[in-house]
UniProtKB/Swiss-Prot annotation:
<dbReference type="GO" id="GO:0030154">
    <property type="term" value="P:cell differentiation"/>
</dbReference>
<keyword id="KW-0221">Differentiation</keyword>
<dbReference type="GO" id="GO:0005886">
    <property type="term" value="C:plasma membrane"/>
</dbReference>
<dbReference type="InterPro" id="IPR001873">
    <property type="entry name" value="ENaC"/>
</dbReference>
<keyword id="KW-1133">Transmembrane helix</keyword>
<dbReference type="GO" id="GO:0005216">
    <property type="term" value="F:monoatomic ion channel activity"/>
</dbReference>
<feature type="transmembrane region" description="Helical">
    <location>
        <begin position="699"/>
        <end position="719"/>
    </location>
</feature>
<feature type="glycosylation site" description="N-linked (GlcNAc...) asparagine">
    <location>
        <position position="473"/>
    </location>
</feature>
<comment type="function">
    <text>Ion channel which is permeable to small monovalent cations. Shown not to be H+-ion gated. May be mechanosensitive and is required for growth and muscle development.</text>
</comment>
<keyword id="KW-0472">Membrane</keyword>
<keyword id="KW-0217">Developmental protein</keyword>
<keyword id="KW-0915">Sodium</keyword>
<keyword id="KW-0813">Transport</keyword>
<feature type="glycosylation site" description="N-linked (GlcNAc...) asparagine">
    <location>
        <position position="450"/>
    </location>
</feature>
<dbReference type="GO" id="GO:0015693">
    <property type="term" value="P:magnesium ion transport"/>
</dbReference>
<dbReference type="InterPro" id="IPR004726">
    <property type="entry name" value="Deg-1"/>
</dbReference>
<dbReference type="GO" id="GO:0016020">
    <property type="term" value="C:membrane"/>
</dbReference>
Length: 887
């Protein structure tokens, strides 16, 4: 390579100039000294030669940092440095100061740039796509999870319902101060009765007015559903109706009423629904009548005097007076078959007291305290709280059954769905619906469950979606079911439907419309986000056959923690096989298991509220990376209208239609628009943006680019190489003693004299690898230049260490020492057949022929030798026959 050649121009000696003249014969035979002198002069000149540039910065045995700096300044593309290279004095300092300040500003901005990138911000791209969206899956449930007839046929579930009935029957109906005093035990009937007997007051059974339960008919306003006036009590098959209020049409509904029984007139009036009566503390009750005016205790008297001055009474704001409560708390039960004229109040009260005592004895003997505590009714007084606890107890009792037994206690598909159409076509019930059992709502049925079939709505609007006629069958409703209607869940077909969390209620007697809009979410993975791929493959995921969702993850983790802490599973969640075949649901009457479950659930709730759920292994529930949600809009209208045919009911048959108004509902789910939204997260600041901003900043402050940075890298590499060479050279100089060059020159002269008679020149120097060219200018007798490349380096003594030093010296371009008695190689160029192509004038073997003007091809230019060297293989060093040129 041209950069690896060592070029040196030397002044030719007079003897060489005379011998190298073109086509002239020498007057005498050249002496050996004339042949050796160029080599000696090249060796001396080579020591003085040092190429310029960043690669050769070692001068006089040390690193010349000043030369390095100057070379870098002249070649640098940094704006400030390049100006400083040509400036002097204070302007040089000015440019360096400006460059330093700009460099500091650049570093500060690079720091903020990296900090911004490390925040991993993201943006949300909202895109509205106008194309047919896939229709969602619809899961339909009855608000009543199990049929009452099926619950009563099972001993465990029947016991749960009986416990609830006993607890809800003993609930407190008092209000205000009466409730507070009753809770503290201050109003015991026995104490009050004892005090009244001591004062000689008459017995309560001899008074005129009594409280009584009776069946009644109430007139209900059709438009508002409000009751109009008092109700009419029924006894012995007759109904007492006010004849003055029969002019208009009466919409009568049966109800259970609390009435005032007048033993003198033998009448039940007034009657109001029992729920509308309130218990108060009356201060001016008349003992012999049982009548109390609307004057109540205000709380000004001392607690010790309350028992003697007040009475418990039931009041109604529409009646404007109260009826005193019996000391034993018994309220008469009047059936429609009772004859008021022959009614024996004392006998009636005695029979009710005996029945109540038997019931209490049965509760005491059959229900252990631990069972009562396990059921959770012990500290509850509110009816809503008691009902909620009863629903949970029923769930625990059913959870102990097998899957088939659970499904048999709930509704079948044909019992729940009466009619169905989709996109104005009839549904195929067995093919379009599948059973999905939910622990809260029992048997639910999912429409569009097949994941391999694509179901789409081709038009927007209620008529082109799913329309179903659902039947509740109120006669099979449990006492714990607080509302009549259905639970509708709109969800993606790949995830678990959770009707208790994400469902919508549709009441009976209405047409419920659910307008749907689809939204797709595409989230980023770390480090930009925390979405999760394939969470359904986790060891704790209990909803087999469904994809990952956040709610499913939370419930799976809760089930895992409960099983590990309590040894049993929560019946609200599935019991997966991963927990083992021995894992059973917690029992409803096991106090320890129920208490452990409550405490564990509270602990989990605290963790989630504080954001510390990550302490539970595999329970940090991130959002899925791809998710499809549905936004639902609800609206309703009264149904049926009365003018349309519903099942077997003809238009205008209001008595038949009333059955469906109380038990059925029309539900329709449809797309509001044939488009959907996609919300896709994308990095707010990418690596490409960082590089672009970095390039802009470096160009703004110091005018640099990537190529400018490579200049610094090159500077570091060259400086490192020079430093390593210096270290190796200093170590070699300290370890070995070098042989002087002039000694080798004297040995070579003696050898040349001996070999002159045999027409071969032998020098006592080691192999010279290659002498590239010796150029002669035959047209000019002035200065001649000889280009010598790759001169052999001098070596030390023959040893393993010296060989390494010699190899290093060769690569560094120093002269190699030739040992005494060693022949100089032939420098001529040969043809492939072995004949001489170019004869060198300084060849130690054939050079004398050139100098004697033999007619052979001679190299006369540097260009020819250089071109020949580049394009041809090096010739072997051996003596071969040569061909005489024909004249």
């Amino acid at each position: 390579m041209a950069e690896d050649r060592i070029k040196s121009k030397l002044r030719r000696p007079a003897s060489i100039e005379s011998t190298m003249s073109s086509r002239t014969k020498p007057r005498h035979k050249p002496s050996p000294m004339s042949i050796l002198m160029p080599h000696l002069m090249v060796g001396e000149s080579f020591r003085k030669y040092r190429p310029h540039g960043l690669r050769n910065i070692r001068m006089n045995g040390h690193l010349d940092w000043n030369q390095l700096r100057k070379s870098f300044e002249k070649q640098s593309t940094f704006h400030g440095i390049s100006h400083a290279a040509t400036a002097d004095g204070k302007w040089r300092w000015f440019w360096y100061t400006a460059f330093t300040i700009c460099l500091l500003a650049l570093l500060i901005q690079i720091f903020f740039l990296i900090s911004k990138y490390r925040q991993y911000g993201k943006t949300v791209d909202l895109d509205l796509k106008f194309e047919n969206a896939p229709f969602p899956s619809i899961t339909i449930c009855n608000l009543n999870p199990y049929k009452k007839s099926a619950i009563q046929s099972n001993p465990n579930t029947k016991a749960m319902m009986e416990a609830y009935s006993r607890r809800i029957g003993s609930g407190d109906k008092t209000e205000g101060i009466a409730a507070a005093l009753s809770a503290t035990g201050g109003l015991h009937a026995k104490v009050r009765r004892a005090k009244r007997k001591a004062k000689g007051k008459p017995r309560l059974r001899d008074r005129r007015y009594h409280q009584a339960f009776a069946q009644c008919l109430c007139d209900i306003e059709q438009l508002t559903g409000d009751r109009k006036g008092s109700c009419f009590a029924a006894f012995k098959g007759k109904i007492e109706i006010d004849t003055n209020n029969t002019a208009g049409f009466m919409n009568l509904h049966t109800s259970r009423c609390l009435c005032q029984l007048d033993t003198v007139s033998k009448a039940l009036w007034p009657c109001f629904p029992y729920s509308s009566w309130k218990e108060k503390l009356c201060s001016e009750c008349v003992d012999n009548t049982g009548h109390c005016p609307m004057r109540f205790y205000k709380g000004n008297e001392l607690y010790e005097n309350i028992k003697e001055q007040v009475d418990l009474c039931l009041c109604h704001k529409e009646y404007n007076h109260c009826v005193s409560t019996r000391d034993d708390g018994i309220i008469l039960e009047i059936s429609p078959n009772d004859e008021l004229n022959d009614l024996d109040i004392g006998k009636k009260i005695a029979s009710q007291l005996s029945a109540q005592q038997e019931k209490q004895a049965e509760v005491t003997t059959t229900e252990a305290p631990t069972v009562t505590q396990a059921l959770g009714f012990e500290e509850l007084t509110d009816d809503i709280a008691i009902t909620s606890q009863a629903q949970e107890n029923l769930m625990f009792a059913v959870g102990e059954m097998s899957e088939k037994a659970k499904e048999s206690m709930s509704y079948e598909l044909d019992e729940l769905v009466l009619k169905c159409s989709f996109n104005q076509k009839d549904c195929q019930m067995d093919r379009d619906f599948t059973l999905h059992y939910d622990n809260t709502f029992g048997n639910c049925y999912t429409f569009n469950y097949n994941r391999t079939a694509e179901v789409a709505s081709h038009r927007a609007g209620a008529n082109y979606g799913l329309r179903v006629l659902l039947y509740a069958n109120v006669s099979e409703y449990l006492p714990t079911t607080e509302a009549v209607g259905f639970r509708i869940t709109v969800h993606d077909k790949h995830i678990v439907p959770f009707p208790d969390a994400f469902g919508y209620s549709a009441p009976t007697g209405f047409m419920s419309s659910f307008g749907v809009r689809m939204k797709q979410f595409i989230r980023l993975e770390p480090p930009y986000g925390h979405c999760r791929h394939g969470g359904e493959d986790a060891a704790t995921f209990v909803y087999t056959g469904f994809q990952y969702s956040v709610e499913a993850c939370h419930r799976s983790c809760a089930q895992k923690v409960i099983v590990e802490a309590c040894g049993c599973a929560d019946p609200m969640y599935p019991v997966a096989e991963m927990f083992g075949n021995n894992t059973k649901p917690c029992q409803a009457v096991n106090m320890d298991q129920r208490e452990c479950l409550r405490n564990t659930t509270l602990w989990l709730g605290e963790l989630y509220s504080k954001g510390k759920e990550a302490i539970i292994p595999d329970c940090y529930c991130h959002q899925p990376c791809q998710e499809t949600n549905y936004e639902v809009t609800y609206s309703s209208a009264r149904w049926p209208s009365g003018s349309a045919k519903v099942m077997e009911c003809l238009p205008g048959d209001f008595l038949c239609l009333e059955k469906y108004r109380k038990n059925a509902a029309m539900v329709q789910i449809f797309y509001e628009e044939l488009n959907y939204e996609t919300m896709q997260e994308s990095p707010a600041y990418t690596l490409t943006s960082v590089l672009a901003d970095l390039g802009g900043l470096t160009g703004l402050w110091i005018g640099a680019s990537v190529v400018s940075l490579l200049e610094i890298v090159t500077l570091i590499v060259f400086a490192t190489q020079a430093y390593v060479r210096k270290r190796k050279g200093s170590i070699s100089a300290q370890s070995h003693h070098s042989v002087p060059v002039h000694r080798a020159s004297r040995v070579s002269l003696n050898t040349l004299h001996k070999s002159s008679t045999t027409q071969s020149v032998k020098l006592s120097v080691m192999d010279i690898r290659s002498i590239k060219s010796i150029h002669s200018n035959h047209s000019s007798k002035s200065k001649q230049s000889i280009l010598i490349e790759d001169l052999p380096p001098a070596i030390q003594e023959q040893s393993d260490d010296e060989e390494e030093t010699t190899e290093s010296s060769r690569t560094n371009g120093s002269c190699r020492y030739l040992a005494p008695g060693e022949d100089l190689p032939c420098l001529c160029k040969y043809h492939p057949d072995g004949s001489i192509r170019i004869m060198k004038a300084l060849c130690p073997v054939h050079g004398y022929m050139v100098r004697r003007n033999y007619d052979y091809s001679v190299s006369n230019s540097e260009e020819e030798d250089a071109e020949d060297e580049v394009h041809r293989e090096p010739e072997p060093f051996y003596s071969a026959p040569y061909e005489h040129r024909k004249k």
